[in-house]
Amino acid sequence: MAGTAAPQAGSFLLTIFLRHDETKTVEQRNEHLRQTGWYDKFPPEGVEIVAGYVMMGIGQVVILRVPAEKLRDTNRVIEQTAWGGYRTEFYPTYDFKPVREAIPHHRP
């Protein structure tokens, strides 16, 4: 995984919550993901995983750098492969750290 969330022209960051389907065991979920091709198709070509985390009680959270023209491909891969194994939520995202560091801080 790349370690920087720096913006690139023509792309945006997309945070995806992949919430576990708790009606399935881990083995059932993994089998579903194998059958649908999740491991081979995600992320789609041209889309970069910037960060990924496992969050206990939630599932996985993945931050992608998505070229604008790849948004539909990203959506379709998730619809075709992740649904049934995960409930999904999407959040357009930006890296606030450089913004915060540019704000003058007044200290007593």
Regions from the language model: what does each represent?
Residues 76-83:
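Short, intrinsically disordered, mixed-charge
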Residues 1-59, 66-72, 76, 94-108:
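Short S/T/G/P-rich N-terminal loop/turn motif that feeds into the first structured element of a domain
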Residues 83-95:
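Conserved short beta-strand edge segments in small beta-sheet-based binding/regulatory domains
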